[in-house]
Regions:
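Polybasic, low-complexity binding patches
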Residues: 38-48, 59-107
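Short cysteine-rich loop/turn motifs with clustered Cys
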Residues: 2-30
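Zinc-coordinating Cys/His ligand positions in small cysteine/histidine-rich zinc-finger domains
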Residues: 54
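Active-site cofactor/substrate anionic-group-binding motifs, chiefly glycine-
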Residues: 51
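Detector for the c-type heme attachment site
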Residues: 21-22, 57-60
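Short recognition patches in nucleic-acid-associated and regulatory proteins
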Residues: 25-41
Length: 107
């Protein structure tokens, strides 16, 4: 079963497009199209494998015929990394450490 988080998807809509910078009200959480990310027939990838993309960029990556598949995958990965960065840097996502975890052991 794939990870789902409606709140995360809603928060990403506040982001500018992580490819072109558009803030035109069309930005959504564009899921990965890769099987390795949980994508299947009629099944979206995990909600943590998303990129904030506007309608135009999302369309170009999902159905674009002007780019090779490898180029579309590379652009999506870049937008995904930027989206995760935006979530943390904007303060919309933060880690809350569990109590009593102790210090991480160094290898």
């Amino acid at each position: 079963m794939n990870y789902r988080n409606k709140t995360l998807l809603e928060i990403v809509r506040e982001s500018p497009c992580q490819l072109c910078g558009a803030q035109d009200g069309t930005v959504v959480a564009a899921h990965s199209n890769q099987q390795r990310d949980g994508k299947g027939t009629a099944i979206k990838a995990h909600d943590y494998r998303i990129a904030a993309l506007c309608y135009s960029c999302h369309s170009q990556i999902d159905q674009g015929s002007k780019m090779l598949k490898e180029d579309r995958m590379e652009l999506w990965e870049m937008a995904h990394r930027k989206t995760i960065g935006w979530l943390f840097e904007s303060g919309r996502l933060e880690l809350i450490p569990e109590k009593n975890l102790g210090e991480f052991k160094k290898s």
